[in-house]
Amino acid sequence: EEYGPDWIVAIGGGSPIDAAKAMWVKYEYPDITFEEMCKVFGMPKLRKKAHFCAVSSTSGTATEVTAFSVITDYEKGIKYPLADFEITPDVAIVDPELAETMPVKLVAHTGMDAMTHAIEAYVSTANCDYTDPLALHAIKMIHETLIKSYNGDMAARDSMHNAQCLAGMAFSNALLGIV
């Protein structure tokens, strides 16, 4: 609070960026409770103090382009979703080179996460002419490159990073909850 940043930059995979989204809300509204933050599409207006930039280093959650954040309470084993277009980052930096150092287990897990998001966007009851092309292209890209990416093909790893972002743009606008 004393520092007063006008930009918050989150770098990492889904969990660090999701945590930074929650911290951004707390920075803008110090008195907001976690329960209030969890009210679906009930966030207060953000960007009064700071804008938000997300730099993704993994290829799965696409949180850098979505209106969602998942905060996990590991002690209770509960995942709390935050959902509001207010927490969509202002700037997303999707540099495929950042994903090239992911361990293969993470490549597999995040790749399946991206595929799930793309399929979910396509079959969503809120899909539309804008979300379907993004979802279908992401599905095609993931189908063609996930195994190659897992096997160390860096061009495929780059493609996966872009595909997960397309899937994120699709599901953030077609909404979630089916798959």
Regions inferred by a protein language model and the residue ranges of each:
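Gly/Ser/Thr-rich helix-start
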Residues: 13-15, 61-63, 112, 169, ...
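Carboxylate- and glycine-rich phosphate/diphosphate-binding segment that chelates Mg2+/Mn2+
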Residues: 68-174
